[in-house]
Amino acid sequence: MHFSKFWPKKAIFVVYVKRQDMAAISNNEIKKVKALQQKKFRDETGLFIVEGEKMVEEALKSHFKVEDLYRKNDIGDEAMKRISSLSSPSPVLAVVHKPSDIYVDDVASVASMLSEGGLYLALDTIRDPGNLGTILRIADWFGADAVFATRDTVDVFNPKVVQATMGAIFRVKMHYV
């Protein structure tokens, strides 16, 4: 069938094509994942972001529960740029559950976590995310059993801290006292 008799010669045709790269993630999901870059939303949801192939692999091997997994091949470059906290987004991002025992309310609880001969690190008011991540990496290297920090220390689930740990966040227990 020839369309010229139905449409004027200079008609403009608009065709809606669903973008392939956004097919696997909705705008609402993008907003929820992006919101996890803020401590308020991490605390409300009990979730945090892990970026990078090695980091996500560490998360999957650990006792942490992975809620969602996003691959650039599935959601596309634009969607990955929108949900990533990195200037150059990695090909994979995971949304992971925070452990339930991160906050300790009393000294008796702390004492019950300690074992004779264990290696523990106590931190007070670490404010720089990169520094906390590096400290956790060093604690992991030395085989620390746990790290205890004051509550005014930067959030261990801050995306910059998570990146700086290079996976140590999944091997060293962290507690806020």
Name each model feature, range by range.
Residues F3, V14-V17:
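Short hydrophobic alpha-helical segments enriched in small aliphatic residues
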Residues Y16-R71, T153-V154:
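Boundary-proximal intrinsically disordered activation/regulatory segments immediately upstream
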Residues L47, E67-L69, P91-A94, G118-L121, ...:
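Structural motif
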Residues V104-V177:
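RNA substrate-binding interface of SAM-dependent RNA methyltransferases
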Residues I75-H97:
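Glycine/small-residue-rich loop that forms an oxyanion/phosphate-binding "nest" at active or ligand-binding sites
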Residues K72-E78, T150, V177:
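Conserved beta-strand termini and adjacent loop/short-helix elements that scaffold enzyme active sites
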